[in-house]
């Protein structure tokens, strides 16, 4: 039986926020385990990433409408609902409310369903608070861009307020999926051809020769990913191996390695003479490292 998309999204959000799951990996796992059509996959992914990315902003919008103490999971459910209300124009308000109330009743009984119903209906009849009215510019940026204030303070000290805001704006921009081409398996052109044969749109990166920007269905379903020709990795993480300028005989220690993308990238550069030791303080994260190693 296929679960409701918003119920799946809520479970995934809780895994990420409460259990420390990696957002990209958990999303891909859920998409692999559930038969969703393309529209539902897109909605699920948007809700999860959006709620996690904007949780401070969403809590700012929620705060005026919460008059009594609510449970943490109810707050997170309301964040998810507010994200849809504020940022997703095509989702009807009644659908947002009805789905949230059903999830609340299922997880916590009728009382929690009534709480969620009352808060959302009151919010949708009211004006949302405006973070532009916050006098302190650093506090305003922390809420508007959903970033911990201590980071804002640190950046403002080093870069000034204007440059800090430019940096923050970049974090909310929509970015394409990036993958790292494993050039020990095939040439870049051959890997691009494999991806295109599977129906992906592929664009070479301007800075890193092994970084590819792709569009299409989730890459984890592709033969290129399963056979180790590409690995999911953010471009910023790829720069680590690039700027290290390692020698092929080097022995590198990655002491906080999970999920292992950077360690595997360095290993690809060092093959076959060099060595990488990848470790992590959390035993349960070692499986993630081993998963990536097996694809080398």
Enumerate the language-model features and the residues they cover.
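S-adenosylmethionine
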Residues: 1-296
């Amino acid at each position: 039986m296929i679960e409701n998309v918003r119920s799946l999204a809520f479970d995934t959000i809780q895994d990420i926020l409460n259990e420390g799951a990696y957002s990209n990996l958990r999303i891909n796992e859920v998409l692999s385990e559930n038969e969703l059509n393309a529209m539902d996959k897109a909605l699920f992914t948007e809700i999860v990433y959006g709620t996690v990315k904007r949780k401070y902003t969403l809590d700012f919008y929620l705060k005026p409408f919460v008059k009594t103490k609510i449970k943490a999971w109810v707050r997170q459910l309301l964040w998810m609902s507010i994200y849809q209300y504020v940022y997703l124009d095509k989702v009807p308000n009644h659908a947002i409310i009805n789905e949230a109330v059903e999830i609340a009743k299922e997880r916590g009984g009728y009382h929690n369903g009534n709480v969620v119903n009352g808060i959302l209906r009151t919010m949708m009849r009211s004006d949302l608070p405006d973070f532009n009215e916050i006098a302190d510019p650093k506090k305003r940026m922390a809420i508007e861009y959903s970033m911990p204030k201590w980071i804002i303070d640190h950046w403002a000290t080093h870069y000034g307020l204007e440059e800090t805001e430019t940096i923050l704006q970049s974090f909310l921009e929509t970015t394409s999926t990036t993958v790292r081409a494993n050039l020990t398996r095939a040439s870049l052109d051959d890997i691009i051809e494999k991806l295109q044969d599977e129906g992906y749109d592929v664009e070479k990166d301007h800075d890193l020769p092994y970084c590819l920007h792709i569009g299409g269905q989730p890459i984890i379903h592709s033969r290129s990913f399963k056979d180790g020709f590409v690995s999911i990795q953010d471009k910023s993480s790829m720069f680590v191996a690039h700027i290290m300028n390692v020698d092929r005989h080097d022995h590198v220690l990655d002491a906080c390695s999970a999920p292992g993308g950077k360690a595997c990238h360095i290993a690809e550069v060092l093959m076959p003479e060099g060595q990488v030791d990848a470790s992590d303080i959390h035993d349960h994260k070692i499986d993630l490292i081993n998963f990536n190693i097996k694809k080398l």
